[in-house]
Amino acid sequence: MEIKFTIKQVVAVGIGAALFVVIGMINIPTPVPNTSIQLQYAVQALLSIIFGPIIGLLVGLIGHAIKDSLAGYGLWWTWIIASGLFGLVVGLFRKYVRVINGVFDWKDILIFNLIQLLANALVWGVLAPLGDVVIYQEAAEKVFAQGIVAGIANGVSVAIAGTLLLLAYAGTQTRAGSLKKD
């Protein structure tokens, strides 16, 4: 199976990964060690909805890997993969959110937020901590606490910033049937 990317998709991955890194350097601490509120997932969610699951996956994987490399504490693959999976899961449900058609009403906002909250709960509350226990032999209590806090924090930040980004994006799109012949 050969996957071909358009120039637009390649640029979206590059810009998305760069934004993931830059925005990811802003860490708002939480009471749980090594866990902070992260704002870059709102941008990743936006790109996942606009460009689909593969672009969302790549933005998370590449962006998080570069961010970890620059941070100096090494690559934490379980969380890098979780970031990619967040974009993948959100992107899989893009057809239910109509921003491409210039529509992002209450129904779309509700659907988007249900999707992203479930994706955050899955990747941060289950997959990342489980990976830490299995691969890195981390203490389950510690990593599940980190994962739950990260999932809640990311869910709230995407609910606010992601919704605002999608509202702004939908406003730039022409609604189907909105043009009339004079």
Curated annotation (Swiss-Prot):
Gene3D superfamilies assigned: 1.10.1760.20
Bilayer-crossing regions: 10-30, 46-66, 73-93, 109-129, 148-168
Keyword field: Cell membrane, Membrane, Transmembrane, Transmembrane helix
One Pfam family from the record: ECF-ribofla_trS
Keyword Transcription regulation attributed: no
Family membership: Belongs to the UPF0397 family.
PANTHER family: UPF0397 PROTEIN BC_2624-RELATED, UPF0397 PROTEIN SPR0429
Name under which the protein is recorded: UPF0397 protein SPCG_0463
Organism of derivation: Streptococcus pneumoniae (strain CGSP14)
